[in-house]
Amino acid sequence: MQVILLDKVAHLGSVGDQVTVKSGFARNFLIPQGKAVMATAANIAHFEARRAELEAKAAEALAAAQARAAKIAEIAVVSVSATAGDDGRLFGSISAKDIADALTAAGVAVAKSEVRLGEGPLRTTGEHEVKVHLHPEVNAAVTVNVVAE
């Protein structure tokens, strides 16, 4: 199925690219999320008329993500407290939601879906490096200091 991308999609293309994808991927993911439209003659003409607007919107989203990444770089370290045993292991864990809440409290709005925990939830006290995926082209890193209560 031929589609026109309205947004940058990882491993597929950027705004305005006309790509061939499997019909299920287009119908179940790209089109419902507003990332693509079917490549009909009418949609191609409509897209060409709106190309400048969509590219400006994509550039604005990239600039906003870069500004948020700069704020996260300024913060550098975020502390999260949790109950822990004597050996430094937590009773429970620190999830992406907890880290997103801590970053939001520090002044940068971050959704839990943007926090990338490579090895799963944090289960020990100490400092942990966590990646924040703000945009397909913008990633930031923050150090999470887990402190025992």
UniProtKB/Swiss-Prot annotation:
UniProt KW keywords: Ribonucleoprotein, Ribosomal protein, RNA-binding, rRNA-binding
Keyword rRNA-binding among record annotations: yes
HAMAP family for this protein: Ribosomal_bL9 (MF_00503)
InterPro entries: Ribosomal_bL9, Ribosomal_bL9/RNase_H1_N, Ribosomal_bL9_bac/chp, Ribosomal_bL9_C, Ribosomal_bL9_C_sf, Ribosomal_bL9_N, Ribosomal_bL9_N_sf
Key word RNA-binding present: yes
Cellular component GO terms held in the UniProt record: ribonucleoprotein complex; ribosome
Role played: Binds to the 23S rRNA.
Similarity comment: family membership: Belongs to the bacterial ribosomal protein bL9 family.
BP GO annotations: translation
Superkingdom per UniProt: Bacteria
GO MF assignments: rRNA binding; structural constituent of ribosome
Protein name per its UniProtKB record: Large ribosomal subunit protein bL9
